[in-house]
């Protein structure tokens, strides 16, 4: 990786240390991504505060790249595998009744936002409009989720 990117990445990791509560979600990937140019482009985009969309055929390394990026940034990973029944409550969270109280059980998107994690949205092309709509404000300039 280019030296300037490596330095900025190290600065990022020092400035944004993961919360102790989620460090178990930071795991070294079992497979190393091979593709320096793509890795550098993704790291540069993320360091600029951009989102990264990985598109391609099956078994082309998209998830491996995402896992490797999360490891490089030392961020917790939250993965959503979309299917026809994935809705907004699956992503953001839903109310549950626990111990005589109604509590919010946060979903992976809300947890990734709370802890500064990488949210890997796998097979997002399978998502219903309801599920995609809640992502808009999180992914655009607002960087905001109303829960």
Predicted features by range, described:
Residues 1-147:
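AAA+ P-loop NTPase catalytic core and its hallmark functional loops
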């Amino acid at each position: 990786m280019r030296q300037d990117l490596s330095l900025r990445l190290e600065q990022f990791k020092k400035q944004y240390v993961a919360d102790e509560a989620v460090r178990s979600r930071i795991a070294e990937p079992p497979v190393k991504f091979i593709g320096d140019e793509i890795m550098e482009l993704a790291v540069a985009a993320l360091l600029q505060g951009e989102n990264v969309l990985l598109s391609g055929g099956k078994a082309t390394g998209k998830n491996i790249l995402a896992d490797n990026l999360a490891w490089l940034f030392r961020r917790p990973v939250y993965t959503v595998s979309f299917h026809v029944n994935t809705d907004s409550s699956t992503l953001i969270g839903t109310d549950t009744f626990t111990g005589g109280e109604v509590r919010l059980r946060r979903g992976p998107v809300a947890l990734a936002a709370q802890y500064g994690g990488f949210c890997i949205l796998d097979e997002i092309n399978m998502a219903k409009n309801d599920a995609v709509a809640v992502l808009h404000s999180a992914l655009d300039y607002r960087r905001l989720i109303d829960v």
